[in-house]
């Protein structure tokens, strides 16, 4: 079997059956195991909480040269075959950590090597740290470091046969034709027209056989003839898909400015000190919108590359990558790789391989780019560090900022966090000065380069608008602002953080609001498709609301099933009716950006327009740099303010301050108009006065009194099941065990001068039912600095698993819904 599977990677069937060797007859003694040349710690690719540590396997002599840390291997575990990943190798079993008491005679052998090394020993150690920190399985943490398309896996097929499944994504090789030194002097016969054509083309540089065949139908025979004569050579080179992410955005230039501002110089100097100290320290670049944080990043990376090291840059939104990658490639050329989920599987694989091979030394992308195999990592940058998109929504539920800080400590490189609205956690750590052994330093950048100034902010009080008889979605100040933009042929950005046409439908007779059959959420109406859609599970239903003659309430049968509230599609229709036909109205939300490169195409369309309005959800609020934008309007600032979440105010402030920063980034002054029914709210006042402390002082007082982060660590334990009683019983047992554990340890906490962890709940989630599963959760508030994850992991192992019941642990939770 080992011999057969060692051929993995050669062109053979996609699945290879794995048949365990037949057991020996009971009357015959088992043969002595083949002596192991070495021993390996193997993480099994079996996602279960019970397998929380590596297992020891022997490496037979025939595989000794192939087996390396990072290799995927085939092993047997119990009565099944399994894939695993080697994370350590030692000549003796006793040298493997935690395996010194094992009997070598009982150690099973590695059956086959399924892949070359896919990760480093340091990556394996970081995965182990993540597994402990986020109460996740080792295998799912390690998979983050594997190439896109995955590694070989062992799956159970029909008839109970285990098979090795290969990655479906394969590299592509291009064949390049080029002239030899002698070929430049070669003169083909006059009758050899195609030879002359080929040589003329190749004198400009190498060309792929594919392009030659497209230009001249078929050139294969001509190429072979000239190759035999030594005129040309054909060279096989790896094709790098995903490198063509070019953009026409005018703001994507990476040209260095004439001079840095004082704030930029101070930030760059602090980053350089952290780089030279090599302690893994953190620098928070706290710069107002438009203050030139990206130029600080570019200058810092230049120094890192000059020192022979590499850099990783994270951005929060896919819509930002086109601009960011454009600026970085303009400065650093093709040494920049891009990595995000909108690339195809083949493009992601090639970008990953570019990094692994050293062809790319800078990676720009979403949070997953953090796990690309950069050699000698010298700098990590997280732009817009306050963004919640850096928190992974599925297991392992890591936060990119925390993993990056751990990586910076291990690689002894600086971590740079940039934001105009830093998170409460980042600001708190800078106030403390030290966190987890690293120094946290905040550098302010309070001014914009050149003559640019922060925009003026006007508050449109919708209560007064209503009192004066206005029923429009646009206040008088916002309508006048849009008219001025059109007159001056400028551009505007409108934010409305609700996609669809209307947030919900409601029966005007009985008050019924149609909800999803599978979730406890109201359905959103989409005018273009005449559907009600669930934004939780994706289900949809055809509907004709009032005044359509077929409109019917699902509860009482009334035809007055009316559209309620505003969505981006409805605002788009209103703008088309209000503004001149030559004004481009461009909508950016989750519905309009589903296709490949949709973000980039819409932004390029906005950039190229003479006069335009960019309407969208939160994806347009940060990072976009268009000097022609002189007006930003917020259609309704109140949606995010009163959500049942202690972070609601922080998120609302971040969103409003960030979108306000899109205005006035060029030579022309900017104006921001915020429509609200709550003008006295601290969030609205802070944005209007450009004074963050108005909000943060109020918000921190509220969090301190209620014991919320950053004063504690918050863990959300979520349980879901199709049977509510099963979910209730399971989470109740978890809560009971945790309370008992910490009650018994209370004297130890008090002697150490620490608060005792608290358990709140269990209770039903705000979204009580999703995808036909009932959801309950409990919250744990833990003292900062106490590793609560170990306690939770121990309790979950004690409770064990229950059929039909699922559990997840979200450490440093952001989503409590």
Regions found by a protein language model. Name each.
Residues 693-694, 700-701, 738-739, 744, ...:
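Surface-exposed amphipathic alpha-helical segments in non-transmembrane regions
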Residues 750-754, 758-771, 808-817:
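Short proline/glycine- and acidic-rich turn/helix-capping motifs at secondary-structure junctions
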Residues 332, 579-581, 741-752, 800:
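Short helix-capping segments at alpha-helix termini
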């Amino acid at each position: 079997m080992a011999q057969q599977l060692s051929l993995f990677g050669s062109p053979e069937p996609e699945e290879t059956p794995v048949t365990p060797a037949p057991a020996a007859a009971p009357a015959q003694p088992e043969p002595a195991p083949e002596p192991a040349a070495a021993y390996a710690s193997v993480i099994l690719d079996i996602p279960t909480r019970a397998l929380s540590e590596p297992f020891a396997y022997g490496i037979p002599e025939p595989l000794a040269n192939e087996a390396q840390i990072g290799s995927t291997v085939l092993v047997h575990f119990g009565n099944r075959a399994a894939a695993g990943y080697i994370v350590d190798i030692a000549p003796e079993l006793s040298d493997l950590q935690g395996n010194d008491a094992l009997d070598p005679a009982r150690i099973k052998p590695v059956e086959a090597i399924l892949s070359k090394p896919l990760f480093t020993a340091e990556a394996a150690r970081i995965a182990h740290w993540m597994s402990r920190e986020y109460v996740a399985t080792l295998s799912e943490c390690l998979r983050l470091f594997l190439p896109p398309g995955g590694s070989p896996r062992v799956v159970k097929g029909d008839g109970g046969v285990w098979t090795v499944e290969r990655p479906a994504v394969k590299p592509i090789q291009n064949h390049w034709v080029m002239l030899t030194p002698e070929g430049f002097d070669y003169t083909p016969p006059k009758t050899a027209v195609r030879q002359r054509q080929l040589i003329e083309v190749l004198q400009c540089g190498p060309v792929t056989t594919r392009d030659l065949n497209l230009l001249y139908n078929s050139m294969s025979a001509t190429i072979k003839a000239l190759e035999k004569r030594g005129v040309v050579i054909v060279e096989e080179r790896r094709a790098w898909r995903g490198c063509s992410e070019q953009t026409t955005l005018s703001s994507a230039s990476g040209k260095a400015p004439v001079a840095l501002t004082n704030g930029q110089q101070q930030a760059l100097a602090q980053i350089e000190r952290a780089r030279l100290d090599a302690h893994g320290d953190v620098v928070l670049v706290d710069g107002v919108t438009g203050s030139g944080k990206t130029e600080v990043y570019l200058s810092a990376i230049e120094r890192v590359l000059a020192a022979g090291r590499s850099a990783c840059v994270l951005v929060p939104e896919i819509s930002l990558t086109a601009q960011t990658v454009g600026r970085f490639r303009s400065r650093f050329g093709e040494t920049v790789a891009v990595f995000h989920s909108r690339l195809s599987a083949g493009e992601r694989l090639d970008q990953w391989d570019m990094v692994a091979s050293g062809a790319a030394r800078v990676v720009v992308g979403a949070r997953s780019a953090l796990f690309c195999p950069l050699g000698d990592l010298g700098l990590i940058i997280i732009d817009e560090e306050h963004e919640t998109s850096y928190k992974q929504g599925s297991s392992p539920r890591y936060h990119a900022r925390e993993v990056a800080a751990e990586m910076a400590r291990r690689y002894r490189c600086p971590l740079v966090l940039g934001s105009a609205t830093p998170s409460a956690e980042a600001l708190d750590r800078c106030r403390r000065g030290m966190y987890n052994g690293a120094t946290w330093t905040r550098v302010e950048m309070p001014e914009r380069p050149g003559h640019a100034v922060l925009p003026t902010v006007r508050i449109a009080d919708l209560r007064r608008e209503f009192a004066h008889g206005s029923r429009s979605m646009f206040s008088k100040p916002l309508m006048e602002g849009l008219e001025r933009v059109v007159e001056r042929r400028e551009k505007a950005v409108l934010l409305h953080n609700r996609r669809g046409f209307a947030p919900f439908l409601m029966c005007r007779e009985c008050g019924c609001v149609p909800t999803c059959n599978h979730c406890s959420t109201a359905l959103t109406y989409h005018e273009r498709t005449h559907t009600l859609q669930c934004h939780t599970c994706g289900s949809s239903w055809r509907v004709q609301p009032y005044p359509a003659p077929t409109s019917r309430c699902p509860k009482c049968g009334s035809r007055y099933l009316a559209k309620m509230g505003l969505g981006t599609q409805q605002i788009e229709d209103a703008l088309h009716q209000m503004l001149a036909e030559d004004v481009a109205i461009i909508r950016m939300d989750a519905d309009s950006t589903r296709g490949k490169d949709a973000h980039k195409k819409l932004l390029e369309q906005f950039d190229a327009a003479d006069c335009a309005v960019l309407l969208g959800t939160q994806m347009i609020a940060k990072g976009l740099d268009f000097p022609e934008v002189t007006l930003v309007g917020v259609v309704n600032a109140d949606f995010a303010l009163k959500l049942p979440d202690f972070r609601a105010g922080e998120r609302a402030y971040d969103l409003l301050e960030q979108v306000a920063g899109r205005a006035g980034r060029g030579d022309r002054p900017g104006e921001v108009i915020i429509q609200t029914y709550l003008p006295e709210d601290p969030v609205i006042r802070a944005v209007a006065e450009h004074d963050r402390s108005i909000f943060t002082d109020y918000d921190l007082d509220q969090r301190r009194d209620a014991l919320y982060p950053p004063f504690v660590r918050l863990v959300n334990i979520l349980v879901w099941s199709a049977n509510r009683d099963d979910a209730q019983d399971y989470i109740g047992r978890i809560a009971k065990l945790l309370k008992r554990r910490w009650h018994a340890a209370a004297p130890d906490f008090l002697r150490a001068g620490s608060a005792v962890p608290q358990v709140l709940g269990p209770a039903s989630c705000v979204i009580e039912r999703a995808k036909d599963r009932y959801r309950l959760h409990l919250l744990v508030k833990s003292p900062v600095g106490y590793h609560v994850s170990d306690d939770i992991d121990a309790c979950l192992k004690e409770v064990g698993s229950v059929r039909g019941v699922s559990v997840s642990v979200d450490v440093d939770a952001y989503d409590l819904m």
